[in-house]
Amino acid sequence: MPGMRRLLIVLLSVVPLYGASPEIFRVRLDTTKGPIVIEVHREWAPRGADRFHELVTSGYFDDSRFFRVVKGQWAQFGINGDPAVATRWRGRTIPDDPPKQSNVRGTVTFAFAVPNGRTTQVYIALKNLADPQDAQGFVPFGRVVEGMDVADSLNSEYGENAGSGIRAGKQQPLFDGGNAYMDRAYPRLDRILHAKVIP
């Protein structure tokens, strides 16, 4: 038992503890095209809302690229530009939330490859994606309340080529090379300059 207690103390000293996020909060993404404001509803997806709050308040999204933008479909982000940081978070999965909201235009949802596999990648629905996203377990945790025109204007010239979705299995260069790779291979990707919780 003393060994378990020591292990717990060590774990608590190296793993940051984040509590529950506020029930409703707003996040402003200052992007290269202008601001996008997301209103998060914890009731929709508690685990997703808590993780998003944790990522924003830790600075994870700052200087990250919108690496997967398909015009009229989605705008995806959430791979940190520092390969060490991105890799460290890649294995920190959260359990699924039961669906309560539909993937309609403007909703914000975690992407994932397998059940209970959400980590850091998020997409904004640029159109109604309820079919097939709802049936596949993609659970919105928020919605864009300001700046949907900004989301629509994000550079989509690279489409699925700059990493694609998690399930496509083509993201390793983004994790290995970070922003240096993305800026070299896809220099016109739009990015998040800074993300923060706002009143």
Where are these regions (language model features)?
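Sec-dependent N-terminal signal peptides
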Residues: 6-15
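N-terminal secretory signal peptides that target proteins for export/translocation
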Residues: 1-4
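Cyclophilin-like peptidyl-prolyl cis-trans isomerases
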Residues: 17-199
